Amino acid sequence: MSKQEKSNVEDKSLDIETAAQVETAQESASGALEELSVEEQLERAKDTIKELEDSCDQFKDEALRAKAEMENIRKRAERDVSNARKFGIEKFSKELLPVIDSIEQALKHEVKLEEAIAMKEGIELTAKMLVDILKKNGVEELDPKGEKFDPNLHEAMAMIPNPEFEDNTIFDVFQKGYMLNGRIVRAAKVVIVKN
């Protein structure tokens, strides 16, 4: 082999070596680009997953709020229906109270004649029937004589001094009060002690 042939072979071998190095460098750069691209894709996928998780959490929260609101509406409706049942006769019972008052006033008078006594007994039975019907429907009588005055249950009509009783004690009842299922229909009209 001549020198020139050796030189050509060496040049070709250098060219092959250089080409191999360039190719390796290109592959390395291309691999880095591919790795960077995969990392970017991974980051984007993570961001998308995070956004979807946030949306899912928001929808869950909205669903829970809607469920709670529906439960509150249901409970409120049940309470309203229950109150309508309990207090539906309130107006009716208020209108009956003057009738009871009139009957009770009539019964306070003493009667001597035998016929009048029989009539009084009939009125007493009528009054008892009326009171029983009201009780059956949840109307309770308030006759607070001797109790402490409570402005939620009683209406003070007059005050009198009486050293035998403590202040704010109910001395007398002008007109009985009535409650319907725990709610005041009419406050008792009373005289209280004020020393």
Swiss-Prot record:
InterPro entries found in the cross-reference section: GrpE (IPR000740), GrpE_coiled_coil (IPR013805), GrpE_head (IPR009012)
A Pfam cross-reference name: GrpE
GO biological process, any: protein folding
PROSITE patterns recorded: GRPE
GO cellular component, as recorded: cytosol
Coiled coil (residue ranges): none
Subunit structure: Homodimer.
Family recorded in the similarity comment: Belongs to the GrpE family.
Protein purpose: Participates actively in the response to hyperosmotic and heat shock by preventing the aggregation of stress-denatured proteins, in association with DnaK and GrpE. It is the nucleotide exchange factor for DnaK and may function as a thermosensor. Unfolded proteins bind initially to DnaJ; upon interaction with the DnaJ-bound protein, DnaK hydrolyzes its bound ATP, resulting in the formation of a stable complex. GrpE releases ADP from DnaK; ATP binding to DnaK triggers the release of the substrate protein, thus completing the reaction cycle.
Protein's recorded name: Protein GrpE
Species whose genome carries this gene: Francisella tularensis subsp. tularensis (strain SCHU S4 / Schu 4)
Lineage per the UniProt record: Bacteria, Pseudomonadati, Pseudomonadota, Gammaproteobacteria, Thiotrichales
